[in-house]
């Protein structure tokens, strides 16, 4: 599991619950010691420093398992590994290609499991309406809105998409 800075400092509960869901599904969740993806540095034009962070992060993530999916609940941090380091920082290393190809957003991964018939959908009914705004970081990755599709699998849940282009 790759929590990134967002999941370690700002959205801690999201990271914790993501790990709990994966463990509930029977996964052994490994959380290698890892640092920042360099997104903040990149956003401030410090490309050389950002590249160093990306290189270290890819080494850290590969150190635990070189075959397993890398699940993240941080769209920004996951997007850095999947797209931005390639497209903006112009990085093209074997390590980054490997890590980027194995990185999944948590909702994207769970929806993939559902599509493969591997997600237990024995959900309890809960009558609730949930407002949802797709993060820009996930929109930029072109993955659609897997969180809406997942929540819609729960009996009684109605999801109201904000349909706003940006928060």
Located regions from the model:
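Iron-sulfur cluster-binding electron-transfer modules in prokaryotic oxidoreductases
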Residues: 2-167
């Amino acid at each position: 599991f790759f929590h990134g800075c967002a999941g370690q400092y700002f959205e801690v509960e999201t990271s914790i619950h993501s790990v709990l869901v994966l463990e509930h599904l029977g996964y052994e969740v490994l959380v290698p010691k890892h640092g920042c993806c360099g997104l903040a540095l990149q956003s401030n034009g410090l490309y050389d420093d950002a590249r160093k962070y990306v290189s270290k992060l890819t080494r850290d993530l590969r150190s635990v398992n070189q075959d397993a999916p890398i699940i993240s609940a941080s769209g920004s941090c996951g997007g850095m590994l999947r797209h931005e380091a390639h497209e903006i920082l112009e990085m093209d290393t074997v390590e980054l290609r490997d890590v980027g190809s194995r990185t999944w957003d948590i909702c994207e991964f769970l929806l993939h499991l559902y599509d493969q018939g591997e997600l237990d959908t024995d959900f309890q009914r809960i009558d609730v309406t949930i407002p949802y705004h797709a993060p820009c970081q996930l929109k930029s990755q072109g993955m659609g809105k897997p969180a809406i599709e997942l929540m819609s699998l729960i009996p009684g849940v109605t999801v109201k998409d904000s349909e706003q282009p940006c928060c």
